[in-house]
Amino acid sequence: MQCECKFEQRRKSRRIEHEFSLSPSRPARLSLPRSCHDTAIPEPHTCVDCRSLAVRICSPEVLVLHVQSFDLGPAGLPIRRLSAADLAACVELAADRGWPPEQNKWRLLFAVSEAYGIDDPAGGLAAMAVLTRYGRQLAAVGTMVVASRFGRRGLGRRLMGHLLEQAGPAVVYLAANSSSYGRPLYQSLGFRSIDTVTRHAGRFAPRPHAALPGSLRSASMSDREPMAALDRKVFGADRGRVLTELFGLAERVLVAEDGRGALAGFAAAWRNESDLVIGPLVAADLAVARTLITAVAAEENGSVRVDIRGGHLELANWAAARGLVPCGSATLMVHGGNLPGDRDKLFAPVSGATG
């Protein structure tokens, strides 16, 4: 099928105006050939040749009229649920904003979260975000990305409003990048800042430290139930699905036991592009957290990353002194209530998108 740009130029002398609507709230007026008048109602579609938004008149063989030059506005672009088939488009959208590919992170998100997006009429995605549910009482919003060409047009507000509606009565939280334009938007929607999360990364340089009473070992299948129980207490909700997917992805999962053999903490280490990410990191105290980080990071020759909450300043200083230097921060924001659980024992999240 031929793109209509040339065809329209030949038929200018035989045109009349015809109204159609891409959405109930966005009428548009186009000039159409007289031969097509009264024969069909214009129907929006995507051109198979150039992927621009178009209107098909009469039949595919008669006319395809391009409307790419019309400003449809954010209200004319519907929000849809994304699937694994959209993963490549999400990675491409993130790259538009300078984000690294992070294939493992995206696969994890699509496995445990609900992804929503707005299509770019010219192809690809104009915006997307994910919602991760932890039961009915808690949910996380992450990877809110709007293509640079669609910036400042309200797509982010529409997406966030949609995610809050989907979350229902749940407390919703997110980590807003320090360089993000999103924080004023989130504040206007009722989010409030409660903490910071700082990304520490680099080559880990271990130092001698006092031995931890108890033991440290690789996790086994028999540890899953005790780990899940500890995590529910600390996190304040059941994130068993996230942990199950993550442990399948992780290179190492370690558990720490106290002197009586009780579970004192655990950590997972998973590969995200060039970094070995440590998270989640759940520990009874600072000493256990340090021991778990050391055990994981000391065996890695490349870059190690751990995201540390602002409330754990002593751990952050300890990590920086061993080569894991601060290299970016985010503001932890919450909507609809307070975060549940014993958060002082949650030293590092799985990721900023999931918590």
Short names for language-model regions:
Residues 1-12, 31-41:
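Polybasic, low-complexity intrinsically disordered segments
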Residues 3-5, 36, 47-50, 58:
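Cysteine-centered motifs
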Residues 59-76, 83-88, 108, 119-121, ...:
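Intrinsically disordered, low-complexity, positively biased terminal segments
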Residues 141, 173-178, 306:
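Conserved hydrophobic beta-strand within the GNAT/NAT acetyltransferase core sheet
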Residues 171-177, 192-206, 326-338:
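Conserved catalytic-core motifs of GNAT/GCN5-like acyltransferases
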Residues 186-187, 191, 319:
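Conserved active-site tyrosine of GNAT-family acetyltransferases
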Residues 199-225, 230-231:
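Surface-exposed beta-loop interaction hotspot
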